[in-house]
Amino acid sequence: MMAAAVVRAEVRRQRREERKKMAAARTTEDPPENHVVADVARGTGAVTRSSSSSLVVSSSSASGSDESSSASPLSFPVSSPSTAVRSPGSAGVSTSLCSVERMVELSAQSPAADFSVSEAWRFEEAVNMALVACEAVSPYDRFRLIETPDENFLLVTNVIPRESAEVPVLDSSSSGGDSGPEDKKKNVGNKTAGEKNGGGSRAKRRRRRRAPKNDAATPSFLRRHDVLERFAAAAKPLPSLCVRDYALRNADRVTYDGELIYGSYLLYRKAHVELSLSSNKVQHVEAVLRQVYTPGLLDHHNVCDVEALLWLLYCGPRSFCARDTCFGREKNGCPFPALLPKLFYEPVRDYMTYMNLAELYVFVWYRGYEFPAPTPQATTAGGGGGSGGGGGAGACAVETSASAGRVDDAGDEVHLPLKPVSLDRLREVLQAVRGRFSGREVPAWPASSRTCLLCALYSQNRLCLDLARDEARTVSYSPIVIQDCAAAVTDVTLSHILPGQSTVSLFPVYHVGKLLDALSLNDAGLITLNL
């Protein structure tokens, strides 16, 4: 035993000496460093090291001078392996400033004119070091890149506030969450007495657990329940997030006996109105198809043939207003296209959301719809060539003009050209969409309405007048608001005064006749709203 103890002590002593030698060698070769300074000027990046406890990425002016002292460095704490104690305020805002001209301008210069490959590599190394430093300080935070007027780039982290619900701390005197020593003694005494008296069967003990009686254990149970109620009553819910361009007010209660429950406003602009009522959407569809096939934008379950899907959405036989009294039949001889959310009339920003909604609308609109078998005279669906209830309408010759819209003999199919799409492709798209949504609970109610914008405004006017006449207590409807067409709004509105706010127009009444007279259709099938 003595020999083993001596051997272990000798081994520990040798290990301590080796660690001291390694630490001494590390100190002589590379002194402890706790921050990095990256100086980048006109494509040249120089990385220096200092001995303070902060990370600085400084910049000089864009003139290309080597005086890095003229820059204003921004310091922020960095966790270093050689730092033993970290201050509590080291989790503050972390910034790194890279002051250079644009990389595009540098790469456009000739190698002989103040620019070389080595300088570009040095610049890239300095920028990468700044990114790595920020990620090391706050690996789970977002970054925001801000460009200054003098073509500098400021990389800021921890700019998004973190919301947390505040829960008051209850002390032991008020909470009563745990039973005191006396209650524990009583419970132990009752349990011992019950065991001495026989205790009863397991079923009786289960019943006693489910419904506690008025015995010594009841006050403790009630106190625990009271603590839960206090926590539930004192907890403050997180503030509701405002949706941009949709919700006007987040109001859910009023000061009188009525109720105010309304959905998001459906905001459209003049450009949205013109594109929604136009039958020619070739330019918009081509802009979508130009980027939609980029790898990584769509998921594996999305439809592969995007062109056929957009054909069904924008100019298919079920993409027009389903009302028999549509204003388009009187204006142009054919119904107007059905109204879609405004993201379908804007440049696409999120292709995943765009495609998922497009597939949902196609699935709902073409539910139970089948294209007829192609005839030898017509093998393509050039402008709605895949007609449905019209029987042999697929064999009809379709005019090439985008304004040549017409209704077939059945009165429910419209033929408007976008681009020739074969019927086989349309059937495959419908089969793929039905295979994705069939048998699943999908929000089909918002997409089930096939109504144009003017018919929707007419129905909104009727609903507004009915609500004003009947003094409805509950309103659950999302009214349409055209933001830059104030000339078409009448003086008749159903308004409500919110507490502490001015009058809010909930259901504006639009002059549909004035909107209809302001529409002008050109030969290309584009509609212009002259208001």
UniProtKB/Swiss-Prot annotation:
Q: Where is this region: Disordered?
A: 1-92, 167-216
* Compositionally skewed regions (Basic and acidic residues) per UniProt: 9-33
Task: State where the protein is found.
Answer: Host nucleus
In the record, which residues are listed under signal peptide? none
**Listed Basic residues bias regions:** 202-211
Protein known as: Protein UL95
Low complexity composition bias: which ranges?
Answer: 50-82
Task: Name the job this protein performs.
Answer: Participates in the expression of late viral mRNAs. Expressed before viral DNA replication, UL95 assembles at the viral pre-replication complexes (pre-RCs) containing the early viral protein UL44.
> Pfam families under this entry?
Herpes_UL95
User: Family assignment?
Assistant: Belongs to the herpesviridae UL95 family.
Segments traversing the membrane? none
One cellular component term from this protein's GO annotations in UniProt: host cell nucleus
InterPro entries of this UniProt entry?
Herpes_UL95
Cite the entry's keywords alphabetically. Early protein, Host nucleus
